[in-house]
């Protein structure tokens, strides 16, 4: 009886470790003005197609700016008007990875960019897990 309890306990602990939600973002980028960059956000520990992925910008000393949202399940994308034409959001379901491409880069694009998971809510996004952030520096 004791051994079976220990086995079940260890099994549940192991399952918990493997199911930990993580959003792992690509590393820091240093790019020239006028160029493009594509950063990634690899999800693990949950069903990728059951939650949305948001992208958020934070410039030094400033607040968070929501860039946009993509639903990996059906491909729906919602952009902040300010970032339309600047940003393209995509996903690769086979690798549970979300991507954000930024083009025509200027010094104003230098910032840390975060991905964040959210539930599907019409018109509002409840972020529950965040990536560690990808710093982007645009040099002239």
UniProtKB/Swiss-Prot annotation:
PROSITE patterns: IG_LIKE. InterPro entries: Ig-like_dom (IPR007110), Ig-like_dom_sf (IPR036179), Ig-like_fold (IPR013783), Ig_sub (IPR003599), Ig_V-set (IPR013106), IgHV (IPR050199). The keyword Signal applies. Residues 1-19 form the signal peptide. GO terms for molecular function: antigen binding. Residues 20-139 form the Ig-like domain. Transmembrane segments: none annotated. GO terms for cellular component: extracellular region; immunoglobulin complex. This is Ig heavy chain V region 93G7. It comes from Mus musculus (Mouse). The lineage of its organism: Eukaryota, Metazoa, Chordata, Craniata, Vertebrata.
């Amino acid at each position: 009886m004791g051994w079976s309890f220990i086995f079940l306990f260890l099994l549940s602990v192991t399952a918990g470790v493997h199911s930990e939600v993580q959003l792992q973002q690509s590393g820091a980028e240093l790019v020239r003005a006028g160029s493009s960059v594509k950063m990634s956000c690899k999800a693990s520990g949950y069903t990728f197609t059951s939650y949305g992925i948001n992208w958020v910008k934070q410039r030094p000393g400033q607040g968070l700016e929501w860039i946009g949202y993509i639903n990996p399940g059906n491909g729906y994308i919602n952009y902040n008007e300010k970032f339309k034409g600047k940003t393209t959001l995509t996903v690769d379901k086979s690798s549970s990875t979300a991507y954000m491409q930024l083009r025509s880069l200027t010094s104003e694009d230098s910032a840390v960019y975060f991905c964040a998971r959210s539930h599907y809510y019409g018109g509002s996004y409840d972020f529950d897990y965040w990536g560690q952030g990808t710093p982007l520096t645009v040099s002239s």
